[in-house]
């Protein structure tokens, strides 16, 4: 649906070249809710501006719904843009217009009939739960209600793609949760592909099925949300995951436990998925290795509706200790594990 092929973007500011994007490649599949996460200045917003051609790539290709738009003119982009809706952090509503007119604006600009406009706007306001607010003005609405108006406006043209640029950053946690639920409903009800730009890993965790992690203009990690949460490969991905899920004990706790430890030991970090959470893993390991297993840390969370568990286990070692059977057990049970040294 959206594909970036070795995309780079360079800006010239005060005779200085700034590389906003460097060799970015990934694909957003049809019906995905795809998250792009990174800190400020990572290149996220530049990336999304390439999709609706507010910026043009310096190198590489941007493919949208089968069209290579990299070198499209504004005229050539008109039909493509009809299939792309967008919502922003600060809503971008017309304060002088009612809720109804804000939502209707794209149809008014497209010179649709009054009958068609009334029918379509009414449908969208009902969908976002604001039918009773149609005659009010933006200043009379809460932040969450303003974003619902923006979502209705983005959907009124029946787009195939919805771009969300930090759409929940200005909202409180409860309102953020309600907006994410609405966006998930948008995806499921209309089959709209959503690309989420955010710096909040909780947004990725709660709504996205796939994610790209960006740092300094580059995509440093991609995968399903479950893959990235279960085994983040890069330091930045690990840092983002740790903001919403504690996946291992603190350094100070490990240091204290190591100081108190008598004899040699081996530690394992394991990731247990929903189908295995109720299994007697610790009991199995005790029987396999014939010794006690210490649980130094355990944390359960929910990712995409699935319960997962992170554990840090410790085995006391002696001359008879053999980790072959333990490793084999983890592999047979499809439990992701890592030996900690």
From Swiss-Prot:
Keyword Zinc carried by entry: no
Protein name, entry field: Methionine import ATP-binding protein MetN 1
Positions with a binding annotation for ATP: 38-45
Keyword Nucleotide-binding tagged: yes
Gene Ontology CC annotations of this record: plasma membrane
PROSITE patterns: ABC_TRANSPORTER_1, ABC_TRANSPORTER_2, METN
Broad EC category: translocase
Entry's family note: Belongs to the ABC transporter superfamily. Methionine importer (TC 3.A.1.24) family.
Keyword entries, A-Z: Amino-acid transport, ATP-binding, Cell membrane, Membrane, Nucleotide-binding, Translocase, Transport
Gene: metN1
InterPro entries in UniProt: AAA+_ATPase (IPR003593), ABC_transporter-like_ATP-bd (IPR003439), ABC_transporter-like_CS (IPR017871), ACT-like_dom_sf (IPR045865), MetN_ABC (IPR041701), MetN_ABC_transporter-like (IPR050086), NIL_domain (IPR018449), P-loop_NTPase (IPR027417)
UniProt-listed SMART domains: AAA (SM00382), NIL (SM00930)
Localisation per UniProt entry: Cell membrane
The protein's Enzyme Commission number: 7.4.2.11
Source species, domain of life: Bacteria
Protein's job: Part of the ABC transporter complex MetNIQ involved in methionine import. Responsible for energy coupling to the transport system.
Main location class: membrane
UniProt GO MF annotations: ABC-type D-methionine transporter activity; ATP binding; ATP hydrolysis activity
Record's bilayer topology term: Peripheral membrane protein
The reaction(s) this protein catalyses: L-methionine(out) + ATP + H2O = L-methionine(in) + ADP + phosphate + H(+); D-methionine(out) + ATP + H2O = D-methionine(in) + ADP + phosphate + H(+)
Quaternary organization: The complex is composed of two ATP-binding proteins (MetN), two transmembrane proteins (MetI) and a solute-binding protein (MetQ).
Record-annotated ABC transporter domain positions: 2-241
């Amino acid at each position: 649906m959206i594909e970036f092929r070795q995309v780079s973007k360079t800006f010239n500011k005060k005779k200085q070249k700034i590389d906003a994007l460097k060799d970015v490649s990934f694909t957003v599949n049809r019906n995905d809710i795809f998250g792009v996460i990174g800190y400020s200045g990572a290149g996220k917003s530049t990336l999304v501006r390439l999709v609706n051609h507010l910026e043009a790539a310096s190198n590489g290709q941007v493919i949208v719904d089968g069209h290579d738009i990299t070198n499209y003119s504004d005229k050539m982009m008109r039909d493509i843009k009809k299939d792309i809706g967008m919502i922003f952090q600060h809503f971008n509503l017309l304060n002088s217009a009612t809720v109804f007119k804000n939502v209707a604006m794209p149809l008014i600009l497209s010179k649709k009939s009054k009958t068609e406009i009334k029918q379509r706007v009414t449908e969208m306001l009902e969908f976002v739960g604001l039918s009773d607010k149609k005659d009010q003005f933006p200043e009379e609405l809460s932040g969450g209600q303003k974003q619902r108006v923006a979502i209705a406006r983005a959907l009124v043209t029946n787009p195939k793609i919805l771009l969300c640029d930090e759409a929940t950053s200005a909202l409180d946690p409860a309102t953020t949760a309600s907006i994410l639920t609405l966006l998930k409903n948008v995806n499921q009800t209309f089959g709209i592909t959503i690309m989420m730009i955010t710096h909040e890993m909780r947004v990725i965790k709660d709504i996205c099925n796939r994610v790209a992690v960006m740092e300094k203009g580059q995509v440093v990690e991609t995968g399903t949300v479950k893959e990235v949460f279960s085994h983040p490969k890069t330091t930045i991905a690990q840092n983002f995951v740790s903001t919403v899920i504690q996946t291992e004990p603190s350094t100070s706790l490990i240091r204290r436990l190591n100081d108190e430890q008598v004899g040699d030991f081996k530690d394992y970090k394991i990731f247990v998925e929903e189908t295995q959470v109720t299994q007697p893993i610790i009991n199995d390991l005790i029987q396999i290795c014939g010794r006690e297993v210490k649980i130094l840390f355990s944390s359960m969370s929910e990712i995409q509706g699935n319960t997962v568990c992170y554990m840090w286990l410790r085995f006391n070692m002696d001359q008879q200790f053999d980790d072959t059977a333990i490793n084999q057990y983890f592999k047979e049970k499809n439990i992701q594990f890592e030996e900690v040294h």
